[in-house]
Amino acid sequence: MEKRDELYAGKAKSVYTTDDEDMLIMLFRDDTSAFDGKKKEALARKGAVNNQFNAAIMEKLKAAGIPCHFEKTLSATESLVKKLDMIPVECVVRNIAAGSICRRLGVEEGLELTPPTFEFFLKDDDLGDPMVNDFHIRSFGWASDDQVAQMKTLTFAVNDVLKQLFLDGGMLLVDYKLEFGMFKGEVLLGDEFSPDGCRLWDKDSREKLDKDRFRQGLGGVVEAYEEVGKRLGMTFEY
């Protein structure tokens, strides 16, 4: 697979075209950011950890019948993925209250949410990724009703798989965000699943093992990511 031009550079990943028009190479960088890019830092090993963590999770999801853009890892920091026409919203499921929902609704962090909540957010850093609903998505033509329904179904299917996976590793899946896109008429899970895009707590101590360590200046960010992987039986190459 020949790596060609850089197509896009985000806050923590770069995407490149290849000699196959249906495939892209996704490079996970060590760059880390929070608060819509206002806080930034490069953390050694993070790109490699997130790439390999994402690969392991995507394989678990594919095995559970969830369609994903992930194809295979190419190196410690690169993966081959299908080229999706991305739907410009994030799907967020919350099993436990933390982060923005606590500020918006005045609820205490740690409140168990039964059933889990589901929210859509528009992907737009300049606007602060505002929360939107099905009607916004329909009115602005971001996705069809059928695509919205599929995104919801797949997002909760991911929850069923990963809640138990992390629980088996002694962790609570607090919340997470997913992105989807279209590939030849099919809705596929895109982007990544790593501790950058979810909240994970130790089941007993409730120690934070995710990007909140960076947001809140707790330190040990990559070490926490590695600990999560270790609990799930992952090994990392650098």
Curated annotation (Swiss-Prot):
The keyword Nucleotide-binding applies. GO terms for molecular function: ATP binding; phosphoribosylaminoimidazolesuccinocarboxamide synthase activity. Keywords: ATP-binding, Ligase, Nucleotide-binding, Purine biosynthesis. It comes from the Bacteria. Its EC number is 6.3.2.6. Transmembrane segments: none annotated. CDD domains: SAICAR_synt_PurC (cd01415). Pathway: Purine metabolism; IMP biosynthesis via de novo pathway; 5-amino-1-(5-phospho-D-ribosyl)imidazole-4-carboxamide from 5-amino-1-(5-phospho-D-ribosyl)imidazole-4-carboxylate: step 1/2. One of its GO terms (cellular component) is cytosol. Pfam families: SAICAR_synt. The keyword ATP-binding applies. One of its GO terms (biological process) is 'de novo' IMP biosynthetic process. It is an enzyme of class 6 (ligase). Belongs to the SAICAR synthetase family. NCBIfam families: purC. This is Phosphoribosylaminoimidazole-succinocarboxamide synthase. The lineage of its organism: Bacteria, Pseudomonadati, Pseudomonadota, Gammaproteobacteria, Oceanospirillales.
